[in-house]
Amino acid sequence: MARLLYRLGKSSAAHAWAVILVWLAVLALAVGGVAVSGVHLSNAITIPGTETQNLADKLKAEMPEANQGTGRVVFYTEDGSEFTQAQRDGIEDALKATEDVSGVDSTVNPFERQQQLDDGRQQLEDGRQKLEQGEKQMAQLQKSLPPGVSPEQVLQQQGIDPNQLEQQKAQLEQGEQSYERMGDYRVVSEDQNSAISVVNFTQEQNAVEADTKTAVMDAVRAHPVDGVGVEFSQEIAQDITALLGPSEIIGVVVAGLVLLIMLRALVPAALPVLTALLGVAVATCITLSFSGAVDMMSVTPMLGVMLGLAVGIDYSLFVLNRHRQQLRRGVEVRESIGLAVGTSGTAVFFAALTVMVALVALNVTGIPFLGLMGTTAGLAVLVALLLTLTLTPALLSLAGRRVLPKKQRNAAPHEESIDEHNVPLHLRHPWITTLACAAVLIVLAIPAQSMRLGLPDASIEAEDSTQYKAYQRIAEDFGAGENGPIAVVVDLPEGLSKAEAQEKINVVSDQLAAQEDVANVLPGQLTDDRATGVIQVIPESGPAEAATEELVGSIRDLNGDLESQEDVHVGVAGTTAANIDVSQLLGEKLPLYLGVVMLISLLLLLMVFRSVLVPVIATLGFLLSALASLGAVVAVYQWGWGGALFGVHDPGPILSFLPTLMVGILFGLAMDYQPVSYTHLTLPTTRLVCRYRWSPCH
């Protein structure tokens, strides 16, 4: 391998412009592929076979309106006073403008909806009063009737059907039960200064285009109402389609500055960054060109972007650093490039191989979006490796001795010396250092035992974002659970009449209302064939809280009694339930992924180094690092320790697929630096001997 890479590096250096043109052609083809196929990304996190996904498919076929995407617009008075009639009219105009947006099916006027709720409650109250008055009159009439004459006979003589009265009484009781289950459900706050409007889209939630969401916000903002503020929920305001954000750009800039300071020359500082950016561009374009052929999430290319930047800079820097050392010893430029690729390049090759194994192994989880994310990230690492072995030598050849600081370019060759008497403290006492580091990592890992997984809601958004403000206002004025309603799907027996089906729905609704952490149970909807019903449940707690997760489990546990007593089956659907299912499945798959990756990569390192100690040290180091990292993440983002330093204002569950991705990335980096460190553990004199052996220094 070292001889092959030596020849590859030297050949690339000799034909520098040809190599550069080839890579520019590859980039052009990749960009052309994206231009031809287009970019088709989705925010959907779907796992085939889960209950929520099966129910979503069922609703899409049987009750399309129940599967429509929705978003909420929160209106509020800026001074906290009640809405005036002029403000209500202005809000109505803004909502009507929203209905003209392509992709919007309808909007719900909160004031009309609240009036309907209030009227319904008032009608029930009036009906109850009339019923009580009628019962009193009936009792008085019964006392005054002669013997042998019943009240029913008198009612019939007056043209009143007694059976109809009983039916009206039953309907009244059903209405009262329905409103009792609804509790204090409102869409306009009790103090009349906050209101929630629902925007119904024509597409399902995860298929709503970002342009449609933006157009909704623009339409509302184009009709400002004096004294009224407006915020948009996460379903409308969130957009995660940007592949490069401020953090990535800042990271590249900081990396460039660090390289400039350490290398003390502009050319060597720019070279690793340039190759990394080219690698990310090629890999990302190739990935996006396939987005029309496979279901691809918006975040799928992001892992490749982050890893591509990291390893692209690292790999190129390893070769560059070896090349600079050899130039200082007087080795000719192209010969030095070949030797650098043959030595450091060999370490980079096997390091990249282990990283790719760790990433591609994400497919063993059986979770499509995670496997695809790992595969595309593996592609980014592969491109970074190929660039390091070909383009980096070409650029080094063109740079010549300018990769050295000016003072060193014409200096006499010299050997690097090692002061054997000035050994660092941690090397003089290796066992103490090892045990101390292990103890610190173990302590950091302790919080990982209480890790709870989930998918983020709007509470993690920036405090000045519209989706965070909407989330908080809804929670304060309408209850935390209003941010994450749960859809309960009821499978009914065949052949039921509408009344019989509604009775089954009422029984299920009563069971749901009796569960802990339930705030409101809204009236159920039936399909035309009365085979399926949908009931919306609003929890007391927020969508990412543990109590909501327990509620979903409690609802599913109702099936035992409901199936035996009512011959119905209930399932839980909706975004909140889907997030819970995805998180649970990812948590179950994490140990499997960890075990498979460690086993495969351990075998790879055993074959590469033909040693047991080096792979074992690398594996144990990774394991401790991974557990400590997970523990630190839990302490900060779930417990809130030091949250102010990291911008954590609302601690909550850990992003469900973060531990799996973190394990993959940390393992890749651990196995990345271990081969490089081991390859570089040689004295300068040994390196010179290696020059004539055509092999890496060991």
Q: Which role fits each region the language model picked out?
A:
Residues 52-56, 60-67, 84-229, 450-639:
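Structured non-transmembrane domains adjacent to transmembrane bundles in polytopic membrane proteins
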